[in-house]
From Swiss-Prot:
Catalytic activity, as annotated: [protein]-peptidylproline (omega=180) = [protein]-peptidylproline (omega=0)
The keyword Protein biosynthesis is assigned to this record: no
Domain PPIase FKBP-type residues, every copy: 165-250
Domain characteristics, as noted in the entry: Consists of 3 domains; the N-terminus binds the ribosome, the middle domain has PPIase activity, while the C-terminus has intrinsic chaperone activity on its own.
Enzymatic class: isomerase
Protein name: Trigger factor
GO biological process, any: protein folding
Source organism of the structure: Wolinella succinogenes (strain ATCC 29543 / DSM 1740 / CCUG 13145 / JCM 31913 / LMG 7466 / NCTC 11488 / FDC 602W) (Vibrio succinogenes)
Function as written in the Swiss-Prot or TrEMBL entry: Involved in protein export. Acts as a chaperone by maintaining the newly synthesized protein in an open conformation. Functions as a peptidyl-prolyl cis-trans isomerase.
Entry GO CC: cytoplasm
SUPFAM superfamilies according to UniProt: FKBP-like (SSF54534), Triger factor/SurA peptide-binding domain-like (SSF109998), Trigger factor ribosome-binding domain (SSF102735)
């Protein structure tokens, strides 16, 4: 095998060796005999096919398998020589030389190893911070918003003009030119003005109408509207406003608190205000975490922790980022790059710094998460994808299959792990 290994640093190594002809022939013979036991060939009983016939028919594939096995043995020997466990191997080794000759195949391989990260006490990396306070004014404002949202609907005073926030009971019918279109008609439809639940311009043109009034309005369906027949079309809607309803004023009270907190046997206004205060405090904490502290924490970790990165992983990340950016380029830019390899290399190199940081953060998060006992379970991963797909109006099962088929689940899991870890560390800082 003539194995030679070189450890460049703690995360990178090379291995050189020869896949000797005798070893390759030995493996080819064994693979041929194994195949002869299982393959069915016309003119021979199963299990009785001569190895020579197998080699003649499947020689190229068997040779590839023999070389693959021999290469794996060389790699295993290289790891042992380097004092590394197979579990430390990161990514697929890159073959940089594969020279076939009469006596075998000369091979050189680049190897990436899991980096060695020395972690201090986790909270030493967390920036100092104070949680925002919650004022009485904020609590009262939220309380009044809640009271307004839960207020019952009541008929508006006679003669009131429709305005934003009001509820309009309408009959409507839509037309393309003189022809009514399917799905464009409803009676006694309750529409909150300003809810933006109808196509743009529809609700705005109802403002100022009074109960009993009729009006024709003109709107244009969005270009990306779900119905191809209606997408981008100008339409007329005939509207009849039958009734205006408004939210009846409701003063917060103990009784109101009981209706909002039915699960609390001792619910009262003070308890409701405490719950509101907790909710606002949580919202402010999440906003502070996401807008400022998580970024600072990651910056601290990247600056404080120095370790070698496997070059193969960094190069793969650069390739990934580079390919993703190509989709945003114009046809002219793509064509220019296609004819200029130096420009391609320069464009790719622009992403080295960000890709290197991304890889470093991934290894840090993985190491810290193991130290802190943080993990993302399969049910959490699936639940997140389901919620996101429903929020986008997509089929959750189809979205999950898309992520699986495009090997995107590991990236989603890592993003969730990073967020979960950073939140955990910041919460631990609060506890002291």
């Amino acid at each position: 095998m003539n194995l030679q290994t070189q450890k460049i640093n703690s995360a990178n190594a090379t291995a050189k060796g020869t896949l000797e002809k005798a070893l390759l022939e030995e493996k080819l013979d064994k693979l041929s005999k194994d195949a002869a036991k299982n393959l069915k060939v016309d003119g021979f009983r199963k299990g009785k096919v001569p190895a020579g016939v197998i080699k003649a028919r499947y020689g190229e594939k068997l040779q590839e398998d023999a070389e693959r096995e021999a290469l794996q043995e060389l790699l295993d020997a290289a790891l042992k020589d380097l004092g590394a466990e197979p579990s430390q191997l990161i990514g697929d080794p890159r073959i940089t030389e594969y020279n076939k000759h009469d006596n075998g195949i000369d091979v050189e391989v680049k190897i990436g190893l899991a980096p060695e990260i020395t972690l201090q006490e986790s909270l030493t990396y967390v920036p100092g911070f104070e949680l925002p306070s919650v004022s009485e004014e904020e609590i009262n404002t939220r309380l009044m918003e809640l009271a307004k949202a839960k207020a019952p609907l009541a008929p508006a005073p006679e003669g009131k003009a429709l305005e934003n926030g009001d509820f309009a009971k309408i009959d409507f019918e839509g037309f393309l030119g003189e022809e009514a279109f399917e799905g464009g008609k409803a009676e006694d439809y309750m529409l909150q003005i300003g809810s933006k639940s109808f196509i743009p311009g529809f609700e705005d043109q109802l403002i100022g109408m009074k109960a009993g009034e009729k009006r024709d309005i003109q709107v244009k369906f969005p270009e990306n509207y779900g119905s191809e027949k209606l997408a981008g079309q100008e339409a007329t809607f005939k509207i009849a406003l039958k009734e205006i309803q408004v939210k009846a004023p409701q003063e917060p009270s103990d009784e109101f608190a009981k209706s909002v907190l039915p699960e609390e046997p001792e619910a009262n206004l003070n308890l409701l205000k405490e719950k509101i205060k907790e909710q606002i405090a949580t919202e402010k904490k999440v906003e502070l975490y996401n807008s400022e502290l998580k970024t600072k924490l990651v910056d601290n970790l990247v600056e404080a922790l120095a370790f070698d990165l496997p070059e193969l992983v960094v190069e793969q990340e650069i390739d990934l980022v580079f390919r993703n950016t190509l989709s945003s380029l114009s046809k002219e830019e793509i064509e220019a790059l296609r004819n200029d390899q130096e420009a391609v290399k320069a464009k790719r190199e622009e992403h080295r710094e960000s890709a290197t940081r991304s890889v470093k953060v991934t290894f840090i998060v993985d190491a810290l998460a193991k130290k802190e006992g943080i993990a993302v379970q399969d049910n959490e991963l699936i639940q997140t994808i389901y919620y996101e797909s429903m929020a986008m109006g997509q089929d959750p099962k189809a979205m999950l299959e898309y992520y699986k088929n495009n090997n995107l689940l590991p990236a989603v899991r890592m993003a969730m792990l990073e967020d979960k870890l950073l939140t955990h560390l910041l919460d631990q800082k609060i506890k002291g």
